[in-house]
Amino acid sequence: MTNALLHPFAPVAKPMSDYINIVRGSGSLVYDDTGKDYVDGLGSLWYCQVAHGRTEIIDAVADQMRRIEAYNIFDPFTNEPADRVAEMIVERSPFPDGRVFLGCSGSEAVDTAIKIARQAMQRRGQTERQVVVRRTNGYHGTNFGGTSAQGIAPNREGWGDLVPHFVEVPHDDL
């Protein structure tokens, strides 16, 4: 364990001895460095939970890594895995002509959605339409836009000015 890692939502001065060091996973279980097992019911917040140690996924990832592990898709580049994932998402969506913006996390997705919504209004000439509605107790990530969008007040505190133009409604108000 290291003090070099800043854990989200943890007190900065939290002692290293208070952390549970997860060292491996199998199926729906993860194990700490003492051998104790835990049900991984979080899906880890940062990725889609598909269970740990699945050999078919490990083999597919290893095969892809042998060809090319990754490459950016900034204009003018693309790559076959990114194209394939985008097509799979559009095929499963209700929008046959849909387009996909690939990101790395839910936090990044929230920030990008805010940007796209505001850009759409700018392009329509409706520059005054900048308000984003958030719900009380809604969690939308740790990035700047997601922190601004979330309805958990303590998570928005201590950062200075956040992204403006959010209004909050009760979580159960349709």
Predicted features along the sequence, with ranges:
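Short acidic-aromatic active-site loops that bind/stabilize oxyanions
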Residues: 74-79, 170
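Short clusters of small/polar residues that mark proteolytic maturation junctions
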Residues: 42-43, 132
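PLP-dependent aspartate aminotransferase-fold enzymes
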Residues: 87-174
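Acidic surface patches and DE-rich sequence motifs
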Residues: 32
